[in-house]
């Protein structure tokens, strides 16, 4: 933060300082200084009301703190002024998908893919829409394009002290345990691994704990098989062993 403040104190024109202002506002949000971050973004947008990065980062801040309706409005404003930028379409689509507004989400993912046919996050979102609608073949096609080479992502850490690095295993097509209520982002630095699309050659982020969030063996067999292989040689504790989850399917339960 001090480095950004020092850059803003330099005698540069305001246009040249704008990216630094946006970075500083986003950092305030990451530090959980919500009020200051929001005020900083509002000040920037008062001067630059159509600036894409400012709108997009402000929408991301609002969504991260649960102001979903406000975030949707900000993303929609970004789309209004930048209709061919796929990122705002994807961000708005993701929020609409969370609200089970699948038709509207699909429209935005389609717009993103029209602008950029290889956009990984748009393929991931479209796959989720199709999966929820029961179109497994269509979902797999989009998931393959969206997650191959993009199977590992890291969530923001909002704590003050050193985090506990954690690996969270998930399935691409749903059937995952909701973890937000207990994987505190002020305690854990969480790297999410989409197990069924992880290239074995991809190095895993540093971690001291693995949490398997894949919970439906009937829906997620390929992901569980990949999770079993991934954890077989792990030297760190594994919570919710994928081998045990695999044995809890309807067929296994019926056999017992």
Stretch-by-stretch model annotation:
Residues 9-12, 42-46, 76-80, 111-114, ...:
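Conserved structural position within tetratricopeptide repeats
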Residues 18-19, 52-53, 86-87, 120-121:
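Helix-start (N-cap) detector for alpha-helical repeat units in TPR-like alpha-solenoids
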Residues 12-15, 49, 83, 117, ...:
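Short coil turns that delineate tetratricopeptide repeat
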Residues 152-165, 170-256:
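Conserved N-proximal alpha/beta basic substrate-recognition cap immediately N-terminal to
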